Amino acid sequence: YTDGNTRNQSVFVNALTFLPLGDVYDAGGNINYEYCKDGGKVNPMADEAKDQYVNNTRSTYFTGNAYLELTPLKGLTFKSVLGTTLSNSRNGVFFGKKSIANITSGYQAPLAEIYNSASYAYRWENVLTYNFTLAKDHSFGVTGITSYSKNQDEANESHAQGQELAGQSFHNLSAGTEKVQVASSFSQTQSMSYAFRLNYSYKGKYLFTFSNRWDGVSHLAAGHKWDSFPAAAIGWRISDETFMEKTQNWLSNLKLRAGYGVTGNSGRKDAAYSSTTGSYTYPSGVGFGNSAAGHIQYGGTYGNPDVGWEKSYNTNIGIDLGLFNGRINLAADWYNTDTKDLLYSRTMPITSGIAAWGSPMKAWQNLGETNNKGIELSLNTQNIVKKNFTWSSNITF
């Protein structure tokens, strides 16, 4: 829980740039608002006067995790993890008539504002693992995973100009006589995942891994919510071969490895497949001879029911080298990543007839592809290892 007040950041800048003339305080010890009339400046300390500028934020935050782990059979392990996060925040702001703070655009002091937000998220993950060995030399590891998460965010804000009761700050917005406006927002997303992984090792020298994920998200349209992402890798620990026995006194590890896998990106969580609208209230009317307060709805984002997952196809070939019982370790990798169906927020052409309020509208689309490849080197050394002193180095290129 936090409860804090924010000072007007322009106080110090104004104090340095204002003319060094006049008195900050009057004879009674009060803030002298127009301390330098010739300079046309108000006192840079005006916001320090009682009820002239208030910016108070109260927040509560909670996070918790719990898990259950069972081993019903030898080699069989089940673990369930549940985590949650809750947060609430209230930010109240008041600008008095003498405030020098940068007031919210479109308003004049006195002005009272309140911003409220609340969010929660939880994630539930279950992992079932079974490790076993056949005929002494064949080791297997099988893992199954399910995961579910949900996130919800909501917010609202209120503005009231003409709140003359400075002593009541932002606690009485109903006293505002002009430009009383409200706004709110809400979003909710959910995701579900299933995963399977198989590990195989023969005598600890020949290694194989295969996995696949099935991920689904709520913010993509039907037919595009789910996709699968397979991966496979192989490894050969050459240093464990019998023909390498003569090198064991200085070569502690030599391993070749290669892998290929697909990863996915579902983009932002703002329902790219569905269109949204915004709203605005004109306190003095929308024009055309109508002076009464008016309310309009306008286009926000344009939904695309065909937008889907962005996919990256990754290839990696590498070698691990360990010398002198692990005192020197070198890893070298060559990688190549092809990313296809890039998610991009594209500006719609004016000729489409689709436009947001005051600007062209944008829509998420899958378009284009990229390629990223290169070589990566990593060197780790244990230079000095003593009982009370250790010096190590790590260099990556």
Q: Positions of the model-derived regions?
A:
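Acidic, Ser/Thr-rich peripheral helices and adjacent loops at domain boundaries
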Residues: 12-17, 21
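Extracellular/periplasmic, surface-exposed regions of secreted and cell-surface proteins
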Residues: 1-13, 36-95, 106-397
